[in-house]
């Protein structure tokens, strides 16, 4: 019995120590904006989803203004399969035709968005689900991708349909929500000036939002610990120039390249620091913001 009691006391002491050590970081981020891109494995795990929602609620209770941007690629693919809609790919990238973009909007701005809102509201906060269409928050234009043909080595342009890139962000609505103690949860769907609807990569959307809000931090929750060196060791902090060198020498490769490039663009647009971290770690948002060492890779100018 005494051992059990002592063990319980030890746990409480550790919790109290963490809260005490977090105070200077809470003060550091008070009244600041933190944009969190929520995606990857964490979105499909109910326990991690609840932990994430509690983290966001705690940020708000600590005087921080969190803004959540979410993805939903696997969920979109699942619904398309159930509806019998075949996806067409160009060089590994899904072509979003008029029928598919309707499904994308339904899944992202509908079911996924409202699930996240409900999780945060269950923690006693006041979250609201939006997309780029609401309040003319974001306008997009059609995005094109260029690839090098492996056989001819000739560059060609890919038309991916209703895939867009943000070109304008109006922060007015987001500022009003922050003043109203509300937490925006944003789906990466936006209108174009041409009246069409565009699906936007969630990382790019989050970077544009963070830049417009001049966020203190932009956090990318991924399925990896952060940027790794060639030995697989986590790199705790990088400058933009260091990150660019790592891309050139092949240390940063594959899917991490566009993510780091998005980080760099966000920094150029006014974000103070961008962090790539593992969303599969419970409470990774708190561990990154409220501890000295953090748990991901911080990229700064």
Curated annotation (Swiss-Prot):
Any matching Pfam family: AA_kinase
Superkingdom field: Bacteria
Site (Transition state stabilizer): 37, 259
UniProt EC number: 2.7.2.8
GO cellular component, as recorded: cytoplasm
Catalytic reactions of this protein: N-acetyl-L-glutamate + ATP = N-acetyl-L-glutamyl 5-phosphate + ADP
Pathway the protein takes part in: Amino-acid biosynthesis; L-arginine biosynthesis; N(2)-acetyl-L-ornithine from L-glutamate: step 2/4
GO biological process: arginine biosynthetic process via ornithine; L-arginine biosynthetic process
Protein purpose: Catalyzes the ATP-dependent phosphorylation of N-acetyl-L-glutamate.
Protein name: Acetylglutamate kinase
Natural source organism: Bartonella tribocorum (strain CIP 105476 / IBS 506)
């Amino acid at each position: 019995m005494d051992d059990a009691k002592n063990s319980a006391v030890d746990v409480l002491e550790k919790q109290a120590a963490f809260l005490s050590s977090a105070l200077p970081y809470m003060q550091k981020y008070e009244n600041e904006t933190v944009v969190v891109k929520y995606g990857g494995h964490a979105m499909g795990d109910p326990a991690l989803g609840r932990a994430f929602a509690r983290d966001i609620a705690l940020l708000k209770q600590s005087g921080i203004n969190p803004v959540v941007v979410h993805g939903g690629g696997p969920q979109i693919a699942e619904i398309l399969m159930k509806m019998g809609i075949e996806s067409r790919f160009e060089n590994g990238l899904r072509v979003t035709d008029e029928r598919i973009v309707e499904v994308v909007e339904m899944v992202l701005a509908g079911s996924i968005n409202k699930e996240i809102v409900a999780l945060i509201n269950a923690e006693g906060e006041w979250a609201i689900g939006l997309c780029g269409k609401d309040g003319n928050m974001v306008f997009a234009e059609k995005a094109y991708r260029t690839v090098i043909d492996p056989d001819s080595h000739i560059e060609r342009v890919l038309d991916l349909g209703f895939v867009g890139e943000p070109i304008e962000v109006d922060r007015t609505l987001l500022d009003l929500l922050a003043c109203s103690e509300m937490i925006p949860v944003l789906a990466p769907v936006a209108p174009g000036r041409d009246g069409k609807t565009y699906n936007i990569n969630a990382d790019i959307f989050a970077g544009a939002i963070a830049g417009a809000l001049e966020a203190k931090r932009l956090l990318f929750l991924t399925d990896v610990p952060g940027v790794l060196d060639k030995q697989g060791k986590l790199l705790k902090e990088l400058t933009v120039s260091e990150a660019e060198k790592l891309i050139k020498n092949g240390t940063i490769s594959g899917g991490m390249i566009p993510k780091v490039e998005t980080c760099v663009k966000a920094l150029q647009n006014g974000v103070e620091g961008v962090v790539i971290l593992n969303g599969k770690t419970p409470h990774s948002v708190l561990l990154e913001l409220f501890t000295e060492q953090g748990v991901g890779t911080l990229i700064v100018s």
